[in-house]
Regions:
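Histidine- and acidic-residue-rich, metal-dependent catalytic cores
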Residues: 1-166
Length: 166
C-alpha cells in the first residue's frame, strides 16, 4: 500500500509540466491528456518485474470511481482493487487540502465533508468509514467557531462523528 501510494502518480512525469501546473481551466483535450497519467504510470512501472502487481494496479486504478465514472477503464464497485480505493481517497484528500496553482487549499473538515458526501458515488463506503476515523479534522485543543458564533476549544472527538467535536 505504501509503495503504491508513493508511485500512484508517477505517470504525471510523462505529462507536460505546463499542463500539470496550468492556472486556468483545462480544455477538453488537455483533460484527456491528464487522464492518460494512470495508464502511462502503469505502463512505466509494469516494465519492472521487481514491482509487485498490486502496486502497478494502484497506479492504474487510483482514478477509478465506485459509480463507474472514473478513468482510465471506467471500472465500477468491486472491480476496483481495494488498495487503489484507499489510495484514491488519500489522493483526493491530499489534493483538496493542498494549495494548487488554480485554487487555495480547503480546510481538513471541508475536505473530509466532501469525501463523506461522495460515498458510494466516488468512494467506497467501508473505506471512507475507516478513513474518517483516522483523519481527525478537529483534534483536541483546536480552536473552533461554533454555529452560534461562539468560540470554543475542542475537548474531545467523536469516533463516529468526526465533523462534530465536543
Amino acid at each position: 500500500l505504501c509503495t503504491g501510494a508513493l508511485l500512484h502518480d508517477i505517470g504525471k512525469v510523462f505529462i507536460p509540466k505546463d499542463l500539470i501546473t496550468k492556472e486556468g481551466p483545462l480544455t477538453y483535450e488537455e483533460f484527456l491528456k491528464i487522464k492518460e497519467h494512470p495508464r502511462l504510470g502503469y505502463n512505466y512501472i509494469n516494465k519492472s518485474p521487481s514491482i509487485k502487481s498490486c502496486i502497478k494496479v494502484i497506479a492504474l486504478q487510483h482514478h477509478e470511481r465506485i459509480d463507474g465514472l472514473g478513468y482510465p477503464n471506467a471500472l465500477k464497485g468491486d472491480a476496483i482493487n481495494k488498495l487503489a480505493k484507499i489510495v484514491s481517497i488519500a489522493d483526493v484528500y491530499d489534493a483538496l487540502t493542498s494549495d494548487r496553482c488554480y485554487r487555495r487549499a480547503l480546510c481538513a473538515s471541508d475536505a473530509l465533508e466532501y469525501i463523506m458526501a461522495n460515498v458510494n458515488k466516488l468512494f467506497d463506503f467501508n473505506i471512507v468509514q475507516v478513513f474518517s476515523k483516522i483523519i481527525v479534522p478537529f483534534p483536541f485543543g483546536t480552536i473552533v467557531k461554533l454555529s452560534t458564533g461562539d468560540i470554543a476549544v475542542v475537548q474531545e472527538t467523536q469516533l463516529n462523528y468526526p465533523l462534530r467535536p465536543v
